[in-house]
């Protein structure tokens, strides 16, 4: 028997020759898979041993699919589109590409689906390039701390729970508590920055609608158009009628569009409305792919689903252009329970949360922010000096007011200090109420909150606070425009401005008429009653044939 001799150099040369002649594209063209079963938006395919994770596959009818489960025998594929025409035995071909979406400035003002295709009937979109959906978030060294404010235009948020550029701020609450209203107002408030033309101030907005009714998405678009905000906004829509795969991918599509701008040195605001429905869609996809279920039937990697998405929101270092992407993820709770599985997951990922309480909403406190449980982990670092200087104790004052209010319900006698605290707290609560689609500018917020926290409103009836605020702001704009301009340009609230505003309050109060039917009439104007002879009257007489009117 001949002796077997192993020569390492021959093996090495053979491997080198094979590697040199290997063409990965050849394998992709030659492999043809077959559908073994299909249904509910999922297909299982055999015969594609070289397929990549998240690779796009093309079915026989042209429909695309996303390779998810790479098992030994077959591949679990999420069908991206109508799956009614996919049947057992059909051919499946590789594309050699991972899932990507088109991106660019031409997406501003448009509504697209999770694959980046326009669905607003305004024609095709010319993309600048394509960007993969699954990309690594910026590393620690590629980031910098959040210190630039992103003004929402909502007094309660900008004063007590500030949001900075690059921050992830969770908005959480039951359904119908005003979560979407906060996002829409925040987008509308960026209009002044956009019209300034300064790239350092402009904020491009992305609204990702996941699992909502088509009529709701249309209403959001209409609201943004009426406010002139669609020109700097992109809507990524995955309505309730879409397959679960689309609802699972929609947030990643929005973040890919935003990352293109962020790495270009621009500022982005992205709203995920809402991630609860994305988690439910991912649970449906995972169960159909026969992945083992965990708590509440969610797959074991549901935390990673949201963490790898939200970690893409960041403030980039100056070496990378200093761009930012600010995230406002929404989570819907059941019965105000923030300790459920998905809410606690997202709370642990984000940089703070704004909790909207249904009881406050039903009590006409809108926005219905629960100050006690809401927090921003960035805090004053993301506030302008003007707001920070006047709102330092506002959150504490409101929390103490809520505690005192609950105590006063059972107490028959309160000392004067407690009564004063309750009176001012009630006025602060009324002051922080804000109708939808009426964002406040920085200088308006400063003047309004200064008046409340310094006791200038203590002599105004609670029912008149809203009207007093509105008319006083108009008075200041008309007679003390320099104060407003100084706050707007310097972002600071000087002692001189405070003194001038104090004089303005003292001059305005005598002119202000309280009461629900009052009007702002100066006292030196004679507002006497009109004589009866000067009034044209009508006399009505009734008879059997009907009523006749005779002018007196």
Swiss-Prot record:
It catalyses: ATP + H2O + 4 H(+)(in) = ADP + phosphate + 5 H(+)(out). Residues 509-552 are annotated as: Disordered. Its EC number is 7.1.2.2. The keyword Cell membrane applies. Keywords: ATP synthesis, ATP-binding, Cell membrane, CF(1), Hydrogen ion transport, Ion transport, Membrane, Nucleotide-binding, Translocase, Transport. GO terms for molecular function: ADP binding; ATP binding; proton-transporting ATP synthase activity, rotational mechanism. InterPro entries: ATP_synth_asu-like_sf (IPR023366), ATP_synth_asu_C (IPR000793), ATP_synth_asu_C_sf (IPR038376), ATP_synth_F1_a_nt-bd_dom (IPR033732), ATP_synth_F1_asu (IPR005294), ATPase_a/bsu_AS (IPR020003), ATPase_F1/V1/A1_a/bsu_N (IPR004100), ATPase_F1/V1/A1_a/bsu_N_sf (IPR036121). It comes from the Bacteria. F-type ATPases have 2 components, CF(1) - the catalytic core - and CF(0) - the membrane proton channel. CF(1) has five subunits: alpha(3), beta(3), gamma(1), delta(1), epsilon(1). CF(0) has three main subunits: a(1), b(2) and c(9-12). The alpha and beta chains form an alternating ring which encloses part of the gamma chain. CF(1) is attached to CF(0) by a central stalk formed by the gamma and epsilon chains, while a peripheral stalk is formed by the delta and b chains. HAMAP family: ATP_synth_alpha_bact. Belongs to the ATPase alpha/beta chains family. PANTHER family: ATP SYNTHASE SUBUNIT ALPHA, MITOCHONDRIAL. This is ATP synthase subunit alpha. The lineage of its organism: Bacteria, Bacillati, Actinomycetota, Actinomycetes, Kineosporiales.
């Amino acid at each position: 028997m001949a002796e077997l001799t192993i020569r390492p150099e021959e093996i090495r040369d053979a491997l080198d020759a094979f590697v040199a002649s290997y063409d990965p594209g050849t394998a992709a063209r030659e492999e043809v898979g077959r559908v073994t079963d299909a249904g509910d938006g999922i297909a299982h395919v055999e015969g594609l041993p070289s397929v990549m994770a998240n690779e796009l596959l093309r079915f026989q009818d042209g429909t695309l699919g996303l390779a998810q489960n790479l098992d030994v025998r077959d591949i679990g594929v999420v069908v991206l589109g109508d799956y009614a025409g996919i049947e057992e035995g059909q051919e499946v071909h590789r594309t050699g590409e991972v899932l990507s979406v088109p991106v660019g400035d031409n997406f501003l003002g448009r509504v697209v689906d999770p694959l980046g295709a326009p669905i607003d009937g305004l024609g095709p979109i010319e993309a600048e390039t394509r960007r993969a959906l699954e990309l690594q978030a910026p590393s620690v060294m590629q980031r910098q701390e959040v210190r630039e404010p992103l003004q929402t235009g909502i007094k309660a948020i900008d004063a007590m729970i500030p949001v900075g550029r690059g921050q992830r701020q969770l908005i959480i609450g039951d359904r119908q508590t005003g979560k979407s209203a906060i996002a829409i107002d925040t987008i509308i408030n960026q209009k002044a920055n956009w019209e300034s033309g300064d790239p350092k101030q402009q904020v491009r907005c992305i609204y990702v609608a996941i699992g909502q009714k088509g009529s709701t998405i249309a209403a959001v678009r209409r609201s943004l158009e009426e406010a002139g905000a669609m020109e700097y906004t992109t809507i990524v829509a995955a309505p309730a009628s879409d397959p679960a795969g689309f609802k699972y991918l929609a947030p990643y599509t929005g973040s890919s569009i935003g990352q293109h701008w962020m790495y270009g040195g621009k500022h982005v605001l992205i709203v995920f409305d809402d991630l609860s429905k994305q988690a439910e869609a991912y649970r449906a996809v995972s169960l159909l792919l026969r992945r083992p279920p965990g708590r509440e039937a969610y797959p074991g990697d549901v935390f990673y689903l949201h963490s790898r998405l939200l970690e893409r929101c960041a403030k980039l270092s100056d070496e990378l252009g200093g761009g930012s992407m600010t995230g406002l993820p929404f989570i819907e709770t059941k019965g105000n329970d923030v300790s459920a599985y998905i809410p606690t997951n997202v709370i642990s990922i984000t940089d703070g949360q704004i909790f909207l309480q249904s009881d406050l909403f039903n009590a006409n406190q809108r926005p219905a922010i629960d100050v006690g449980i809401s927090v921003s982990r960035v805090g004053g670092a993301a506030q302008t000096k003007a707001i920070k200087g006047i709102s330092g104790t506002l959150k504490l004052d409101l929390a103490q007011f809520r505690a005192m209010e609950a105590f006063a319900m059972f107490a028959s006698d309160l000392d004067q200090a407690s009564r004063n605290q309750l009176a001012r707290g009630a006025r602060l609560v009324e002051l922080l109420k804000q109708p939808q689609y009426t964002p406040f500018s920085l200088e308006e917020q400063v003047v309004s909150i200064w008046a409340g926290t310094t006791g200038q409103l203590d002599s105004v009836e609670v029912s008149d606070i809203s009207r007093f605020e509105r008319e006083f702001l108009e008075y200041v704009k008309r007679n003390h425009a320099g104060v407003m301009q100084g706050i707007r340009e310097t972002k600071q609230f000087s002692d001189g401005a405070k003194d001038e505003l104090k004089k303005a309050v003292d001059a305005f109060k005598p002119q202000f008429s309280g009461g629900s039917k009052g009007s702002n009439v100066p006292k030196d104007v004679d507002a006497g009653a009109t004589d009866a002879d000067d009034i044209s009257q009508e006399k009505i007489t009734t008879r059997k044939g009907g009523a006749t009117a005779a002018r007196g």
